[in-house]
Amino acid sequence: MKRKFSLLLAMIATLAVNAQNPQKGDYGYLYCHMSDKGQWTAYAVSRDGYHYEDILGGGPIMDPKEHARIEGGQRDAFICRSWDGKGYVMVTTDMNNSMTKALGKQSEWDNYGIDLLKSDDLIHWTSVSFDYRKGTEIFSNPNDKSVYKEWSTINRVWAPQIFWDPD
């Protein structure tokens, strides 16, 4: 894993050194997505927003089993800067449809949670998984009256897009 992160850092450094930036300051686009090679989050980079190249050959930027604690797969990744601009927040759907039988799911598209991740450097992540089958205990105030009666019936949870609104 250290080798992958070293390679990622080397690739990013190479891009920064070789780029002939016509603008002052940093620019470019980072796209986080589910890799077509597996059910994990991968990065791709672009200078123009149209042409992207996978980093690490589309390999995982983190261990999905460490951060997707419900099913061990990550889909629908969305990333943004943290509210203070000093880090990053990512949300992913915790789903691995190749585990349908092993997990006893009725459908390969059933899933039960989302993962919220935080990083200071886009490489090292901490995370928490929200398993909706556990009901209100996953929320910040589990004693509030629930508007939903039967949490165990929830079987299609998808990661939302996220943003910070300072107002």
Named regions from a protein language model:
Residues 19-167:
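Carbohydrate-active catalytic/glycan-binding domains of CAZyme proteins
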Residues 1-2, 73:
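Intrinsically disordered, low-complexity sequence elements enriched in Ser/Thr/Gly/Pro
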Residues 2-9:
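Sec-dependent signal peptide recognition
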Residues 10-18:
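Hydrophobic h-region of N-terminal signal peptides that target proteins for export
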